[in-house]
Amino acid sequence: FKQKTAYEISLGLVGSEMCIRDRVITYIKALPGCAKIETKTSLNLSQPFNRMKVRLKKEIVTMGQPNIDPSKKVGRYIDPKNWDEFTKKDDVVVIDTRNKYEIEIGTFKGSINPDTDSFKKFPGWWEKNKDKFHGKKIAMFCTGGIRCEKSSNYLLNQGVKDVFHLKGGILNYLEKTKKVDSNWEGECYVFDHRVSVNHDLNKGSYECCFACGRPLSLTDRSDSKFEFGVSCAKCIDEFSEDRKARFRERQKQILLAEKRGKDHLG
């Protein structure tokens, strides 16, 4: 179980057997103000979370803009069934609001990559590039919809009139769109042990580098600079030998825990 709570929104992820999951959702929806809470489901063969984790944050996803308040106004929602048709219009610009390492493994055809390594850099990117999009309708998307709630509020506050975003994010689109009809290319990065999911929302082909957190393809993991649990070709020069030694010790403890049939929680 993983829970993040801020004044703007609460985000919860539950990994459980289906019968328990249904009971959890029923319980949450019975709480005051939670009857219409939005849920998404995907299947996995193993537990995606090692432990229960609850965090109180100023922002669920840090944007660093003091006047952002998605509870007051957001862009207009586009349902997954209408997304592809809408985004193919000549007067629509499609922007992926996620980080570049997420976009590298999958995105919508023809979408713009802001090439940012954190969400708080999105406002700066917009300020530098907004003149290119003058007079256009702006359609944005992200993994589950939270970053779009905030980025659409930001653009509306900047005076942009026609702001839209994908309802429920990429995961909702993949759930409700047949692959043969889809405008999605690649896999979708997710923030749990699955690392990525494919179009069927099953665990994808990517694994995560423990050191830098970047998603690694099979080719990346076959690189001579890749050391499992320690570093990859993308980050091998980013960490000192002391830190790499600590990563190796951690990996050793993980393997020992696995031999004992236990999960390593560190």
Language-model segments: residues:
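Generic structural signal for beta-strand residues in well-ordered domains
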Residues: 11, 85-87, 131, 202
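Rhodanese-like catalytic fold shared by cysteine-dependent sulfurtransferases
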Residues: 16-74, 99-138, 146-266
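Structural scaffold elements adjacent to functional motifs in cytosolic proteins
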Residues: 95-96
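A generic local structural motif
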Residues: 4-7, 80-82, 124-128
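Short, small-residue-biased leader/transition segments that mark boundaries at the very start
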Residues: 3-20
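Internal catalytic-core helix/loop-beta-alpha segment
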Residues: 68, 73-92
